[in-house]
Swiss-Prot record:
Residues 1-25 form a propeptide. GO terms for biological process: defense response to bacterium; killing of cells of another organism. This is Lantibiotic streptococcin A-M49. Maturation of lantibiotics involves the enzymatic conversion of Thr, and Ser into dehydrated AA and the formation of thioether bonds with cysteine. This is followed by membrane translocation and cleavage of the modified precursor. The lineage of its organism: Bacteria, Bacillati, Bacillota, Bacilli, Lactobacillales.
Length: 51
């Protein structure tokens, strides 16, 4: 079996609910991440504080 077939078979094993979560089409169209509820300034400070 080629890699393409393996990839297609792997995708077919994912349920529609799991796919919705992966692509961010869940409840509100938002996939929650660690930075979802944080302000950009907080992350900018953390990224530049030690440079």
């Amino acid at each position: 079996m080629t890699k393409e077939h393996e990839i297609i078979n792997s995708i077919q094993e994912v349920s529609l609910e799991e796919l919705d979560q992966i692509i961010g089409a869940g409840k509100n169209g938002v996939f929650k991440t660690i930075s979802h509820e944080c302000h950009l300034n907080t992350w900018a400070f953390l990224a530049t504080c030690c440079s």
